[in-house]
Amino acid sequence: MRKLILATFLLLAPTALLASGGGEHLESANIDLRDQASLQRGAKYFMNYCTGCHSLQYMRYNRLAKDLGIDEIALRQNLLFGDAKPGDLITKAMTDDDALKWFGVVPPDLTLVTRWRSPDWVYTYLKSFYLDDTRPYGVNNVLFPLVGMPHVLGDLQGRQEAVMEPSHEPGGEPTIKGVKLVEEGGLSPQEYDTMVRDITNFLTYAGEPFQLERERIGRYVLLFLGFLFILAYLLKKEYWKDVH
């Protein structure tokens, strides 16, 4: 029994540690993968603001268009840039050499970002930039301290400052309690929240395009297993009726 308990603990402990994260407060993204309009807007925002530096190297344009209900004309007009073709993988415009020169690091591919982080993390991250004159691009991030990227949505969100909380220990450093808007951007806070939610929704879809289909098929699988259980139970009763 002890070995069974120990084995169960060893299996579940890594999952619990990953789920706990770093203890930061995350806002709920409240995404809906069934909201096709949100997914379409998120795809548009990602292509316009993110693909300069980030790729979705496991996703093709035509697969995205098929899943999100985007016809070829709209795909070519709104999502394809440069020499990109519908059958191409979604790559970034920037070369790795240029990325190293400008940022000191190659920006990560974002296909699986909501799976190895979480949708709530991505949503909160995009809302957590604040002014910091000590950083190369003048901004920092509450969730990702010393972030190396500029706030590409800053003109839309506006400028935020960090809200500091004094340390409760003598000689301790103040900590960041949150952020506050000090200069309005091109969008209202509500409009920016919706935009960030759409981007998060799209990235969640990109991380697992089959998720909705998997859930749909899963319901039939559970019904089949339930029916199979009933048959197995009736068969068991038939086999054992003479014994009892």
Swiss-Prot record:
Record key words, sorted: Cell membrane, Electron transport, Heme, Iron, Membrane, Metal-binding, Respiratory chain, Signal, Transmembrane, Transmembrane helix, Transport
Transmembrane segments: 220-240
Gene3D superfamilies: Cytochrome c-like domain
Molecular-function GO term, any one: metal ion binding
Post-translational modification: Binds 1 heme c group covalently per subunit.
Disulphides: none
Subunit structure comment from the entry: The main subunits of complex b-c1 are: cytochrome b, cytochrome c1 and the Rieske protein.
Any Pfam family: Cytochrom_C1
Signal peptide span: 1-19
A Gene Ontology term for the protein's cellular component: plasma membrane
Binding-site residues, heme c: C50, C53, H54
Topology versus the membrane: Single-pass membrane protein
InterPro entries: Cyt_c-like_dom, Cyt_c-like_dom_sf, Cyt_c1
Name of this chain's protein: Cytochrome c1
Annotated compartments: Cell membrane
Function: Component of the ubiquinol-cytochrome c reductase complex (complex III or cytochrome b-c1 complex), which is a respiratory chain that generates an electrochemical potential coupled to ATP synthesis. c1 functions as an electron donor to cytochrome c.
